[in-house]
Curated annotation (Swiss-Prot):
This protein is involved in the repair of mismatches in DNA. It is required for dam-dependent methyl-directed DNA mismatch repair. May act as a 'molecular matchmaker', a protein that promotes the formation of a stable complex between two or more DNA-binding proteins in an ATP-dependent manner without itself being part of a final effector complex. The keyword Ribosomal protein does not apply. This is DNA mismatch repair protein MutL. Belongs to the DNA mismatch repair MutL/HexB family. It holds the Pfam family MutL_C. The lineage of its organism: Bacteria, Bacillati, Bacillota, Bacilli, Lactobacillales. One of its GO terms (cellular component) is mismatch repair complex.
Length: 668
């Protein structure tokens, strides 16, 4: 008897659902795309408990005919293509006929729909893929579909869902992308009775950007437009001054379909050339109009990825369009006087909101402890070791190349460093390569030193260096009794700063400096959700945020170790970094924050120091617990002992040299 048999439709749909319906956000995406294909002008998304209880999508589109409503839930039933030729020129969001049967196979679905001119509509109810009820029902034009009891018959799938907050974040993100891709459609998104997002649907993309990323971001967007024989590129990109810590703020659409394409994302970044800081990315919304023949959308189960013809041509067009637009823009940031001189209504509104946010509100005292102004090249003195703070901060980080002993400087671990960083996507802080010596590599080790290592290190302390001069505004030349030292000034101050900040950030101190005017921070809905999840983590490093509206937070004070004049930037950098790397413990965040602060506050390459500043740097370096490496593991110094120097100048030669014995020492 044969073993092969055909699967029944319900089981086949459940298998297909494993690829198409991964989580509640997948349901939202598929249902909203169906609404867009139905020429809807308005789409309302209503979600309960992050989609775990219910997802409801209401539109004013074409609706479904009564005779088609049952067929719509059959696998591979679609109105969008009729032949294989249509598959190569698809212009609709959906076309496979998989979404509705896949959703119905793993949930409880109720759909009510009506077409224009009909006196009544039709309602259908399915559960687990089985049709339960089909009957006439009162309905306005469009479709109203509600999905409940998701994965009731596949409980194992529930185990792979993230927390409700994470699932809500993913739903919000996909709605934002769909709204950016379709500015002519009015979207609204409500969760647990609270409206989280609304767009006007007036085809003004810049307004949609402002609704998602904030009004200030919307004002700093540049409109772009470019075309060639095959492609037309349009949209908005942010000024170089407006950046984020990840690429997640870049949205690319093809014929108003949101896609993910790493090469096109790189093209957007390339268009900025050197105008972006390392590790920072723009906000961008780019739509590409092209002949459907040039794109294959049938290469991914969820259609998030596509295959493009003439991709290199498109990459060049995107990069050049952005490059030309930025080239004609005045990139000197303007001071917005309005933000410093608010009108009376704004002052009254701010005062009212402050009082509502906190029952007890007092203006910041004028006698608040001021932060000390320090020059860019002034180095904080490391404080006494505190094992409790060190333990609280140490965490697992990629194993750096660490030099524990003085003699290791004679055989530095530069070769290992080169091997690690030569393929990294991000460049090192300097364009010039660091000199290398390759006698023998030093094995990577953990940043923490055990007791034995610390005892050994005390016996091999960093030498007291006598300053000689500076090379290329980047390296300090110094000498000691055992030879020449070349010190990377950025890495040296980064190490000094790191040990200072690690101590300060590790302290949970009551010493806070009040802002004279509380700082109001605005974020997108997705970012605000992430911040709400990590308020305790931020409080642990001295940033106590309070909710101040839907996507806004208020910060009344900051740690006293913030540098004067940079308080707002420092707070925003720390919050932005947490948004990008949300999956961190408090200990890890403290460690990473200390590293970030030490790097940003260190002197850079091509910065010329006077003799006093250089000597101060060399004097404080030996006071560090580990003066041999920066926090990222890069060597601080390279050492040439006397023997190395003499060999370089042939003042001594190897014993195997045939003529070495023919010369007396005094001849050299």
């Amino acid at each position: 008897m044969g073993k092969i048999h055909e699967l029944d439709n319900i089981l086949a749909n459940q298998i297909a659902a494993g690829e198409v319906i991964e989580r509640p956000a997948s349901i939202v995406k598929e249902l909203v795309e169906n609404s867009l294909d139905a020429h809807s002008h308005r789409v309302d998304i209503i979600v309960e408990n992050s989609g775990l209880d219910s997802v409801r999508v209401i539109d004013d589109g074409d609706g479904i005919a009564a005779e088609d409503i049952s067929l719509a839930f059959h696998r591979h039933a679609t109105s969008k293509i009729n032949s294989r030729h249509d598959l190569f020129k698809v212009q609709t969001m959906g076309f496979r006929g998989e979404a509705l049967p896949s959703i119905a196979s793993v949930a409880d679905v109720t759909l009510t729909t009506a077409q224009a001119g009909q006196e009544e509509g039709t309602m259908i109810h399915l559960r687990g893929g089985k049709e339960l009820v089909v009957k006439p029902a009162g309905a306005r034009q469009g479709t109203d579909i509600k999905v409940t009891d998701l994965f009731f018959n596949t409980p194992a799938r529930l185990k792979y869902l993230k927390s409700p907050q994470t699932e809500l974040t993913r739903i919000t993100d996909i709605i934002n992308r769909l709204a950016l891709a379709n500015p002519a459609v009015a979207f609204s998104f409500t969760h647990n009775g609270r409206e989280l997002f609304r767009s006007a649907g007036n085809n003004n993309l810049q307004q949609v950007v402002a609704a998602i990323y904030g009004v200030q971001a919307g004002r700093k967007m540049l409109e772009i437009s470019g075309a060639d024989d095959d492609f037309k590129v349009s949209g908005f990109v942010s000024l170089p001054e407006l950046t984020r810590a990840s690429r997640q703020y870049i949205t690319i659409t093809i014929n108003h379909r949101y896609i993910r394409n790493f090469e096109l994302t790189k093209a957007i970044i390339q268009g900025y050339e050197s105008k972006l800081m390392v590790g920072r990315y723009p906000i961008a919304v780019i739509n590409i109009d092209l002949d459907p023949v040039l794109v294959d959308v049938n290469v991914h189960p969820a259609k998030r990825e596509v295959r493009l013809s003439k991709e290199q041509q498109l990459i060049k067009l995107i990069a050049e369009t952005i490059r030309q637009r930025i080239a004609v823009e005045n990139l000197i940031p303007d001071v917005d006087a309005d933000q410093f001189i608010p009108n009376d209504d704004e002052v009254a509104d701010l005062d009212r909101r402050l009082k509502e946010a906190s029952p007890v509100y007092h203006a910041a005292p004028i006698s608040a402890v001021p932060a000390t102004e320090k020059a860019a090249t002034e180095i904080p003195t490391p404080e006494a070791d505190n094992p409790a703070h060190a333990d609280a901060l140490d965490s697992e980080i990629p194993a750096p190349i660490v030099i524990h002993h003085l003699e290791d400087l004679n055989t530095p671990a530069m070769q290992k460093f080169d091997e690690r960083y030569q393929n990294e996507g991000e460049v090192t802080p300097f364009s010039a390569p660091v000199p290398t010596m390759t006698k023998k590599p030093v094995k990577p080790a953990n940043i923490e030193l055990d007791v034995h290592d610390k005892q050994d290190q005390q016996q091999n302390r960093f030498p007291d260096l006598q300053y000689i001069g500076q090379l290329q505004g980047t390296f300090l030349l110094a000498q000691a009794g055992d030879g020449l030292y070349i010190v990377d000034q950025h890495a040296a101050q980064e190490r000094i700063n790191y040990e200072y900040y690690r101590q300060k950030i590790g302290e949970v101190s009551a010493d806070q400096q009040n802002f004279l005017v509380p700082l109001v921070l605005n974020y997108s809905t997705v970012d605000a959700m992430t911040i709400n999840q990590h308020l305790d983590t931020l409080a642990a490093v001295g940033l106590e945020l309070e909710s101040f509206g839907q996507n806004s937070f208020i910060l009344r004070s900051h740690p006293t170790w913030f540098k004067e004049g940079q308080e707002e930037d420092t707070a925003e950098e720390m919050i932005d970094w947490l948004i990008k790397n949300g999956k961190l413990t408090v200990k890890e965040f403290r460690m990473k924050t200390a590293i970030m602060m030490s790097c940003k506050r260190a002197i850079k390459a091509n910065h010329h120091l006077d003799e006093r500043e250089a000597k101060a740097l060399l004097k404080r370096l030996p006071q560090c617990e580990n003066p041999f490496n920066c926090p990222h593991g890069r060597p601080v110094t390279v050492h040439f002992n006397d023997q190395d120097l003499e060999k370089m100048f042939k003042r001594i030669q190897d014993s195997h040299t045939p003529y070495a014995d023919d010369f007396d020492d005094h001849e050299f």
